């Protein structure tokens, strides 16, 4: 209801809904039904609905999720934790948390490929691109559409992105 008010009464029709931690396509359907019951329907008045791609099932079933959502945003922190089975806040396991781990980068590559194959945009939010310019360059080489960055890493990461884009032509 609040989102409907923001879009319709306050005039912020460019607000995009981002659905977090959506485990299954059936759960996505229930979320979209609940939104529709409250007057928010995908495509009406330009409403776009994105899904956080932060669970391995989101990547594996991306084709099915893409029929329900307008885009994805990779939640690299949660995806890394769930792919590697680690808790980045644990004193015992935090040293194993790394978005650049091969299992994680393969999962991210697959997510990007699957989203683009379905004709939808995919971005990334999380610490990875801000903390590791080489990770940002990897994302560019894979064709990511957008990245969120921490303000203190913006200039450094933009330089890495520009260099990677120059190399990819």
Positions of the model-derived regions?
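Conserved alpha/beta-domain cores
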Residues: 1-169
């Amino acid at each position: 209801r609040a989102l409907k008010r923001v879009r319709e009464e306050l005039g912020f029709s460019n607000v995009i809904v981002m659905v977090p931690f959506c485990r299954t396509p059936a759960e996505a359907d229930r979320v979209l039904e609940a939104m529709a019951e409250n007057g928010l329907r995908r495509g009406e008045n330009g409403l776009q609905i994105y899904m956080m791609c932060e669970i391995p099932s989101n990547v594996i079933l991306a084709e099915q999720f893409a029929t329900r959502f307008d885009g994805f945003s990779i939640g690299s922190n949660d995806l890394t934790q769930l792919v590697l089975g680690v808790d980045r806040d644990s004193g015992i396991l935090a040293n194993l948390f790394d978005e650049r781990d091969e299992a994680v980068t393969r999962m991210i590559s697959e997510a990007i490929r699957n989203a683009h194959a379905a004709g939808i945009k995919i971005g990334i939010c999380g610490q990875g691109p801000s903390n590791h310019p080489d990770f940002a360059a990897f994302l560019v080489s894979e064709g990511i559409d957008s990245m969120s960055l921490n303000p203190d890493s913006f200039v450094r990461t933009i330089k890495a992105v520009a260099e990677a884009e120059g190399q990819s032509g």
